[in-house]
C-alpha cells in the first residue's frame, strides 16, 4: 500500500540522532518524514539524565553552531549546570547539565512539531526499499510504503535488542519498548557487516526513601553557563543539587558473591560494553584494590521522585540490585522504582560508511547514532545532524560536506569511525583531537556557523547575531592593540596592581592580557581599558585568542602541513591492485577501508609513509591527483 505523499528524506527513529537528522533537511527546505515507533518518546533520555561533559559538551556546542536542537533543549531542561575543568586550559573546559527528562522531551517535541517541512508519523519501519542499489523508501509494520530519495536509519539500541536482568532475557529496544527485529533481519540481508555491542543502565531509585540528610551535596556553578550561543540563563528552570554516596566493602562482597548470576560473567552476553562507562560488576573486578567507588545521585526531574544513581549500571538480578543499593550510606531503606539492565543490540561496521555517513554499498542510505558503534546522546546527535545535512545535499545532487579533524569534534568522531572502525562503544574525548586548542567550546560558532549559513541550516536572526559578535571581537582586539601604557602613564599604578612585577617599558592592552596573571575582566575594570564588552561570549574569545595566540598559530601551521595530504582525494572506485610496490597487507587494508583521501589513508593502522608515497606517485601518473576544498 503506497502512501499518497512522497518525501525527499525519511528518518527512521526519534532518538537524539533521529531528531537532529530530521530537523536538518527540513531546515534546508526538503520535505522530510520522521518515522518513530512512539511519538511520546521523541527525544527520550534513555539512560543518564544529563547532557554534555568532557568532549561531549564540545559536540553539543558544535551541533548548536550549525542550527541543531540539543543545546537549546538542554538550556530549557537543565536543572544543574557546571563547567568541568574550569581551572584548566580553555581546550578542555566543558559544559555539563543535569536535565529534567520531561522538560527535555517536551523541548524536543515542540521543536519537531513546529518545524516547517517536517512530518511525524508513528509506525514501526520494517524494510528499506531499494531500487538499482539506491534507497527508495521505507515500508512499515502495517503495510504502508513511503517513498523518498534518501533514508536515514537512527535505530539506536532497537535493532535486535535483547534486555538482560540476571539470567533472564527478552527482546526489547529499551525498557518498555519493543525491539526492531524484522528490520534487523532485513538489514543483515543487505550484506553490511554487522556485530553486537552492549550497554547498560542502573536501577532508578525512589527519592522519598533516600536519607539525603546524611549525604554530601553537589551544587551547580554559581555563575550558570549556557549551552546555546543563542541561549540565556533566563531559560534555565529551577536549579537543584545532586548528592553523593559511595560503595563499600559490603557492596563489593554482594557483587562478588553473585557473579555466577551475572549475564556478563556467565557468557550469556557476548557484546562488548563501553570502556568508559563500565558496569559496577566490571568496576569491582577490574579495580579489585579499590575499597570504594563514588556514586552520584542525580534527580531525574523537578516533578519526579526518580533518582538516577550514576555509577552502578548493572545487569545483576533484581534481588542482588536491592542488596547493592541498600548497602550504601543513605540508601539503607531505599526502594528501586525500575531495575537496572544490560542491553545487547546490532551495530554496523562504520568502515562501511563514507565520512558523510552514507553507506558505501547503497546510495542514499545513511546511518547515524549507536548503530555506528558509538555511545552517548551527544555522539548520536552529532552524527544525526551530519547525516541529515548530507541526505539533503544528496537529494539536491550537491557536493557532500563533512568536517575535517582540525575543524570540529564531529570531524574527529566520524574520521575515527570511518577510518579505524570500532569494536567497543566509542565516545568522544578531548584527548582524541590533535588540534584541541582550536576546537574549543567557545569558538564552535566561529568554526561552523558560516558553513551552516551556507548550507541553509540557520535563520537570519542567528546569522545577524553571529556577525555582530564576530565584529565586536575584531573591534575589541584592535582597541586593545591601540591603547598603550608607558612608565609615566597616569594609569600605571592601577596596571601595576594587576601585575606580578611592575611595568618597566610601554605595553599595549594585548601585551598585558598575554600575561598569565592578567584577565580580561580585571584589565577592563581599570580606567585605561574600560569599558569591557557586554557580550561575555565575545569577551571570552578575545581573551583566549590573545593569551594563546602563539600556541594557536603553531597548531594552524601544523594543520596547513597536514592539509596537503588531507585534501588529496582518492577516486571512489580506485583499483589498488594496479598500484605496483604496495605490500599485500597494505593493499588489503586500503581495499577494506576505501579511504576518501590520502590523509585518511595515512591514519589506517599498517599503512606506512612509504606506501603513501607510492600511492601519490601512482595517482599522479594516472592523472588522478585531485585536491578537495
Curated annotation (Swiss-Prot):
Its cofactor is FAD. SUPFAM superfamilies: FAD/NAD(P)-binding domain. GO terms for molecular function: flavin adenine dinucleotide binding. NAD(+) binds at residues 273-287. One of its GO terms (biological process) is tRNA methylation. GO terms for cellular component: cytosol. Pfam families: GIDA, GIDA_C_1st, SAM_GIDA_C. This is tRNA uridine 5-carboxymethylaminomethyl modification enzyme MnmG. It comes from Actinobacillus succinogenes (strain ATCC 55618 / DSM 22257 / CCUG 43843 / 130Z). The lineage of its organism: Bacteria, Pseudomonadati, Pseudomonadota, Gammaproteobacteria, Pasteurellales.
Amino acid at each position: 500500500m503506497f502512501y499518497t505523499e512522497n518525501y525527499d528524506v525519511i528518518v527512521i527513529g526519534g532518538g537524539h540522532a533521529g531528531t537532529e537528522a530530521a530537523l536538518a533537511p527540513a531546515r534546508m527546505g526538503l520535505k522530510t518524514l520522521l518515522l518513530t515507533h512512539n511519538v511520546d518518546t521523541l527525544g527520550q533520555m534513555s539512560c543518564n539524565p544529563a547532557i554534555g561533559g568532557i568532549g561531549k559538551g564540545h559536540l553539543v556546542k558544535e551541533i548548536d553552531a550549525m542550527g541543531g536542537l540539543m543545546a537549546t533543549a538542554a538550556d530549557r531542561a537543565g536543572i544543574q549546570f557546571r563547567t568541568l575543568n574550569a581551572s584548566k586550559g580553555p581546550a578542555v573546559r566543558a559544559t555539563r547539565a543535569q536535565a529534567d527528562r520531561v522538560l527535555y522531551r517536551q523541548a524536543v517535541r515542540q521543536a519537531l512539531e513546529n518545524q516547517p517541512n517536517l512530518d511525524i508519523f508513528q509506525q514501526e519501519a520494517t524494510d528499506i526499499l531499494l531500487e538499482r542499489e539506491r534507497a527508495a523508501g521505507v515500508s512499515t509494520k502495517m503495510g504502508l510504503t513511503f517513498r523518498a530519495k534518501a533514508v536515514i536509519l537512527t535505530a539506536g539500541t532497537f535493532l535486535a535488542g535483547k534486555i538482560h536482568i540476571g539470567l533472564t532475557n527478552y527482546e526489547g529496544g529499551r525498557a518498555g519498548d519493543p525491539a526492531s527485529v524484522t528490520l534487523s533481519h532485513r538489514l543483515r540481508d543487505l550484506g553490511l557487516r554487522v556485530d553486537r555491542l552492549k550497554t547498560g543502565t542502573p536501577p532508578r531509585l525512589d527519592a522519598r526513601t533516600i536519607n539525603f540528610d546524611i549525604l554530601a551535596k553537589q551544587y551547580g556553578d554559581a555563575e550558570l553557563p549556557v549551552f546555546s550561543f543563542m541561549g540565556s540563563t533566563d531559560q534555565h528552570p529551577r536549579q537543584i543539587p545532586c548528592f553523593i554516596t559511595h560503595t563499600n566493602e559490603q557492596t563489593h562482597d554482594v557483587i562478588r558473591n553473585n557473579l555466577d548470576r551475572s549475564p556478563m560473567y556467565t557468557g550469556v552476553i557476548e557484546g562488548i560494553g563501553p570502556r568508559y562507562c563500565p558496569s559496577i560488576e566490571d568496576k569491582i573486578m577490574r579495580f579489585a584494590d579499590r575499597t570504594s567507588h563514588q556514586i552520584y545521585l542525580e534527580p531525574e526531574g523537578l516533578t519526579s521522585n526518580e533518582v538516577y544513581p550514576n555509577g552502578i549500571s548493572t545487569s545483576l538480578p533484581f534481588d542482588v540490585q536491592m542488596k547493592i543499593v541498600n548497602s550504601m550510606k543513605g540508601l539503607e531503606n531505599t526502594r528501586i522504582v525500575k531495575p537496572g539492565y544490560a542491553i545487547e543490540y546490532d551495530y554496523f561496521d562504520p568502515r562501511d560508511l563514507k565520512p558523510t555517513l552514507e553507506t558505501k554499498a547503497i546510495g542514499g542510505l545513511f546511518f547515524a547514532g549507536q548503530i555506528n558503534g558509538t555511545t552517548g546522546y551527544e555522539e548520536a546527535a552529532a552524527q544525526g545532524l551530519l547525516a541529515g545535512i548530507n541526505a539533503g545535499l544528496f537529494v539536491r545532487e550537491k557536493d557532500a560536506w563533512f568536517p575535517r579533524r582540525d575543524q570540529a569534534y564531529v570531524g574527529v568522531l566520524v574520521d575515527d569511525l570511518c577510518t579505524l572502525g570500532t569494536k567497543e562503544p566509542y565516545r568522544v574525548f578531548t584527548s582524541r583531537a590533535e588540534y584541541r586548542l582550536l576546537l574549543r567550546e567557545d569558538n564552535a560558532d566561529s568554526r561552523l556557523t558560516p558553513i551552516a549559513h551556507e548550507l541553509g541550516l540557520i535563520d537570519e536572526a542567528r546569522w545577524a547575531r553571529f556577525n555582530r559578535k564576530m565584529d565586536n571581537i575584531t573591534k575589541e582586539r584592535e582597541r586593545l592593540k591601540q591603547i598603550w601604557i608607558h612608565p609615566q602613564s597616569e594609569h600605571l599604578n592601577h596596571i601595576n596592581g594587576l601585575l606580578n612585577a611592575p611595568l618597566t617599558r610601554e605595553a599595549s592592552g594585548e601585551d598585558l592580557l598575554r600575561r598569565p596573571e592578567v584577565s580580561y575582566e580585571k584589565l577592563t575594570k581599570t580606567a585605561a581599558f574600560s569599558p569591557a564588552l557586554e557580550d561575555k561570549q565575545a569577551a571570552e574569545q578575545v581573551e583566549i585568542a590573545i593569551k594563546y595566540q602563539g600556541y594557536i598559530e603553531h597548531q594552524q601551521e601544523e594543520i596547513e602541513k597536514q592539509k596537503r595530504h588531507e585534501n588529496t582525494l582518492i577516486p571512489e572506485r580506485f583499483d589498488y591492485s594496479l598500484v605496483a610496490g604496495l605490500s599485500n597487507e597494505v593493499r588489503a587494508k586500503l581495499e577494506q577501508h576505501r579511504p576518501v583521501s590520502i590523509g585518511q589513508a595515512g591514519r589506517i593502522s599498517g599503512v606506512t609513509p612509504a606506501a603513501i608515497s607510492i600511492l601519490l606517485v601512482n595517482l599522479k601518473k594516472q592523472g588522478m591527483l585531485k585536491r578537495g576544498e
